[in-house]
């Protein structure tokens, strides 16, 4: 059972750098609820999270304040002979509605080539004072010999190398892409192409390959769509049917979900036909039928009387209703308009393939298999599954945590956390288990993962027990248990490894983690960096001396993350 569970817990997933354990110092609060924190990478001794009054007031643009600070501290950031303006590119500038600060997102570059996984977030107060700099740098790039040479491999050959390593000919969902990066491969730093292979057949995959631009060798790879089973026989692809939105009038229907409960459905009436198309929210919600094939999105679900009680309707009923619940949660709690915060439509496809034991976000929509009836029932029947997967989309459009090692485990944990909080929001038999409603229908009380007791399914509940191998993208579905346990303790309280945590409730848990994921976490955030970002997020929301700040720190103490 344990081996089975280890294989199956990779169900809930999305799309490289692993940082060593860091040391930190946190002192009393600086003005405006900014904690004075210094956290450095233990190996390269560069800052990972610095907060406090980092500069005086300024009338300069926020990015210029950040560049001035980094130039003043260029030795700490190990920029070598380059200045900050040549070492970082501003990729986003947004306003923080809580602190009225300007948040600047930066991408590290070398010779105008982006450095994989090396991004920074900086918070500049309304008066121009720099408050926080968070992120990971690749050090001393001007000293790396391989970066002084010329690339020998072009983009086309890099794609060919990735396809050869893949070992089979897929049916692509979109054309392969390739982009040149500076890439850290352990202690080696070189130019590498990041190749993306996105396909549905013979088994869904969204691979990222790292191909050395000098030698043409594959340095690393990972898949951001995980499958329960191994590669299957090819499922014949049908020609993509028309799946255009319809124009009509809003209607209210009803239907029975996978577990037999009745739900109200927002639909569209057009030419005497009802469609599972909800036009009433800031983002339109569409639900499609793949008809047991693998072509996406399929056909828009239709009905003649707006009553969806047939057995085959159940998966569509839940996919449609739960997508709406998840949208409402993010909109009502955080004023977020869909996963991209810009009203992107929420598309779901059910009855994907035949007996398919998986659900995934493919970068643009949700996809649900029917399960084989023994391991899983239709996977859209789990609200926490839908909340989990759509949260991957939120993360992709905010921190964009790389789906490997600690950043990948943090990515998974955030999806588990918000999948659970969406379940509590709808108040439909909520709990701190993941996938319990759709997993092993013949076994009562079973689930994929437990946030309250990760060890129940073989996952670590303390940093000292973390998985250190390379399987499962470096243990993203395993080490997520450490963050899951911290989150559970933060919401509910309890004593773990001799550390007592005062619970603050699920609502505050969500606010703190959402703020950190959107305004403090960067692509390569480690558990230690996450702690610093979450503590500061709590200080922003509730005050530097608040119980919430204390509880966040204690929750990480309890799982051994400093």
Curated annotation (Swiss-Prot):
GO terms for cellular component: extracellular region. It catalyses: Similar, but not identical, to that of thermolysin. InterPro entries: FTP_domain (IPR011096), PepSY (IPR025711), Peptidase_M4 (IPR023612), Peptidase_M4/M1_CTD_sf (IPR027268), Peptidase_M4_C_domain (IPR001570), Peptidase_M4_domain (IPR013856), Zinc_Metalloprotease_M4 (IPR050728). Ca(2+) 3 binds at residues 423, 429, 431, 436. PROSITE patterns: ZINC_PROTEASE. Pfam families: FTP, PepSY, Peptidase_M4, Peptidase_M4_C. The active site is at residues 389, 477. Residues 1-24 form the signal peptide. Residues 25-245 form a propeptide. Belongs to the peptidase M4 family. This is Bacillolysin. It comes from Priestia megaterium (strain DSM 319 / IMG 1521). The lineage of its organism: Bacteria, Bacillati, Bacillota, Bacilli, Bacillales.
């Amino acid at each position: 059972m344990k081996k089975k569970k280890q294989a199956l817990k990779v169900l809930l997933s999305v799309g490289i750098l692993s940082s060593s354990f860091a040391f930190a110092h946190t002192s009393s609060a600086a003005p405006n609820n900014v904690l004075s924190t210094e956290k450095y990478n233990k190996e390269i001794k560069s800052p990972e999270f610095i907060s406090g009054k980092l500069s005086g007031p300024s009338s300069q643009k926020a990015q210029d304040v950040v560049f001035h600070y980094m130039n003043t501290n260029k030795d700490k950031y190990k920029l070598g002979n380059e200045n900050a303006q040549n070492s970082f590119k501003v990729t986003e500038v947004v306003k923080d509605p809580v602190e009225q600060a300007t948040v600047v997102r930066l991408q590290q570059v070398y010779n105008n080539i982006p450095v994989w996984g090396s991004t920074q977030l900086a918070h500049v107060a309304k008066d121009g004072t720099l408050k926080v700099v968070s992120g990971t740098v690749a050090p001393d790039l001007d000293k790396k010999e391989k970066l002084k040479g010329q690339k020998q491999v072009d983009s086309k050959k890099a794609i060919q190398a990735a396809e050869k390593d893949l070992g089979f000919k897929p049916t692509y969902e979109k054309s392969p892409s390739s982009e040149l990066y500076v890439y850290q491969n352990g202690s080696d730093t070189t130019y590498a192409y990041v190749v993306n292979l996105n396909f549905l057949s013979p088994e869904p995959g969204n691979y990222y390959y790292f191909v050395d631009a000098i030698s043409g060798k594959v340095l690393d790879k990972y898949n951001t769509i995980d499958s329960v089973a191994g590669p299957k026989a090819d499922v014949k692809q049908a020609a993509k049917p028309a799946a255009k939105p319809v124009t009509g009038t809003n209607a209210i229907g009803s239907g029975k979900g996978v577990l037999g409960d009745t739900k109200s459905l927002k639909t569209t009436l057009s030419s005497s036909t009802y469609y599972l198309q909800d036009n009433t929210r800031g983002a339109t919600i569409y639900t499609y039928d793949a008809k047991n094939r693998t072509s996406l999105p399929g056909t828009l679900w239709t009905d003649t009387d707006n009553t969806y009680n047939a057995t085959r309707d159940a998966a569509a009923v839940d996919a449609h209703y739960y997508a709406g619940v998840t949208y409402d949660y993010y909109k009502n709690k955080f004023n977020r308009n869909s996963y991209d915060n810009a009203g992107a439509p929420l598309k779901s496809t059910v009855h994907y393939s035949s007996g398919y034991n998986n659900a995934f976000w493919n970068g643009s929509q949700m996809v649900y298999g029917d399960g084989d009836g023994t391991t899983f029932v239709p996977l859209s029947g789990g609200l926490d599954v839908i909340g989990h997967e759509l949260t991957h989309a939120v993360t992709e459009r905010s921190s964009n945590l790389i789906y490997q090692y600690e950043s990948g485990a943090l990515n998974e944990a955030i999806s588990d956390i918000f999948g659970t909080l969406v379940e509590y929001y709808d108040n439909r038999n909520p709990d701190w288990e993941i996938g319990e409603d759709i997993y092993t229908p013949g076994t009562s009380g079973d689930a994929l993962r437990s946030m309250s007791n990760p060890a129940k399914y073989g996952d670590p509940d303390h940093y000292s027990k973390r998985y250190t191998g390379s399987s499962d993208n470096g243990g993203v579905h395993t080490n997520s248990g450490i963050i899951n346990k911290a989150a559970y303790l933060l919401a509910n309280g309890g004593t773990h490894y001799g550390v007592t945590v005062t619970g603050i409730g699920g609502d505050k848990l969500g606010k703190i983690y959402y703020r950190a994921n959107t305004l403090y976490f960067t692509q390569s955030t480690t558990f230690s960096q996450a702690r610093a970002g979450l503590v500061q997020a709590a200080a922003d929301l509730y005050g530097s001396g608040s119980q919430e700040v204390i509880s966040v720190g204690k929750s990480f103490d309890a799982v051994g993350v400093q």
